[in-house]
Amino acid sequence: SRGLGDVYKRQDEDYAAGWRLSCSTKPAGDITVLVPDIASAYQSRMKTADLSSGEEIAIFNQLQQDVQAAGVDFANDFVQAVLTLDEPTLDDTMPDTERLARFAQDAFDGCTEVKLTYHTVKKLAKTLREANFKVQITGTLTDGVLTIMDVSEKEDAPLYGCAIDIGTTTVTGVLMDLKTGTLTAKASAGNGQIRYGADVINRIVEQGKLGGVKRLQDAILKETLLPLVAAMCKSAGIPVSRVFRVCIASNTTMNHLLLGVDANPVRMEPYIPTFFQWRGMTAKDLGFPANPDAEILLAPNIGSYVGGDITAGAFTSLIWDKDEFSLFIDLGTNGELVFGNRDFMMSCACSAGPAFEGGDISCGMRATDGAVESVKIDKDTMEPTLGIVGPEGQKPVGICGSGIIDVIAELYRTSIISSKGQFVREGKRVAHDEHGMGRYILATAAESETGREISITEVDIDSFIRAKAAIFSAINIMLSSLDMDVSVLSHVYVAGGIGSGINMENAVRIGMLPDIDRELFEYLGNTSLSGAYAMARSDCAVDKVDELASNMTYMELSTNPRYMDEFVAACFLPHTSRELFPSSIQE
């Protein structure tokens, strides 16, 4: 095994190669500073998914079946009805609101009271007369109280909901029919806040500046969500006013910044956010593109760095419905974990950085068309075989998270890089710059879509090693705090929108996931989004997610004195303690 001395040796080698810590370096003269253009890499064009293949629909249908089998009813309180009202006369002078309420109450069994929203009242007179007093109403019927949210002259006006996963790096949404659950559109885009920092800490610092709260809120609400929802509604052929419920799953900081709430307490000891759960908000309160009275549901947070994206994801994983111990891992800019079973659950978060989603990687990108999502390298020729997101014949544009896992694992397996992530073999696919920094060429300029070389450098590899080390050290700390180890795990669920799937063997090979039976691993995709979908559709799912959040114990890693030692030890391939990865020794 390797000790911490290797870490200091590595730092000495970096210094000898010309690397310096910018925070402790004073320039003696004019210098040129190169800053990675992280923002432009993630503010790429919005992608609206083609649902005609049925792949996305199949995923969400399977979710519905699984959670229903666990006792969750996919029903909600939304109702619609077509009403033919008596037209007013000089002898029948009942006002429009009372006339509509009377006919609406008769249309539903058990309805004891009718309420109209302000939005409905404003448009009521014109709509009734243009429709000759035959209209469709849309609203909710809860405990006998009918709340009419909209009145339409169209007798078949649709009833839609929207589910959104707001990630630190990427935002993804789906549009659904609230009655049937059918998906009609999906879209994703980079989080507009990325230009203010790649991680939540930098964004919290930015929002603390003059006008910062408004800037950060506008970046996610106006620059990201508004066009995202508009694109989905256009794809589905409906106006945004037909969206009557919105569920958003995001981390604690993203929730605060979306609502324009000061997030600074999240990063200050004792790390207490303004809220964990906030209900009763409507689209008009937030300025969200939907029916003005549409309910905005936020999946509940459970800690300063474990938010609604994880409560929604833990719900989707169904670890709460199992007797055996399971581990749920969400690979994102903030790596979050949940461990437990039906009796208890514990959660924690670690700052993995944006590498899992292609950030801080020279040729990194989100998992959209042109992303290299899988890599295989021939040990003798060192030539790569690439799997690329997109239609047949798609040329590579960059590399996404799953592809980065593969290429680093393959470089290590073929002995092209050492356990420190440095290049130790030469070949036509390995090149070095004027400073001696090595890189592996995945695609030459002629082979790529952009006409630029696609490669992974030693700096990229180092960034990713730190990201995987954050995940593995968090797993170790969480389990050891319970006097357990990885041998107790019966299931390991991996989530995150980093590609169409993860090669679990390679994830173990680089030391990101524990070296246990590979059959125990399952990739679930974007569970934050699928959990938000369930909450948007099902009142029972909302109650269950709230219950999970209230019963989940939060573990603050930043105050654990052992975490940094565990992290440093994991900053090698696969780890300084090779005995933790017996399969890599056999290789």
Where are these regions (language model features)?
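Short, small-residue-biased leader/transition segments that mark boundaries at the very start
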Residues: 3-8
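Nucleotide/phosphate-binding catalytic cleft detector across ATP-hydrolyzing
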Residues: 9-163, 168, 180, 217-218, ...
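Glycine-rich phosphate-binding loop of actin/hexokinase-like ATP-binding domains
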Residues: 164-168, 173-201, 265-278, 312, ...
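N-terminal phosphate-binding loop and adjacent alpha-helix
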Residues: 192-235, 360, 371-376, 463-466, ...
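Phosphate/pyrophosphate-binding loops at sites that engage ATP/ADP/AMP, CoA/4′-phosphopantetheine
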Residues: 225-244, 475-489
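Short glycine/threonine-rich loop-to-helix capping motif typified by GTGT followed
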Residues: 251-265, 436, 484-487, 496-515, ...
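Catalytic phosphate/nucleotide-handling subdomain of diverse soluble enzymes
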Residues: 341-343, 484-548
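A contiguous, well-structured pocket-lining segment that forms one wall/lid of small-molecule binding clefts
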Residues: 412-482
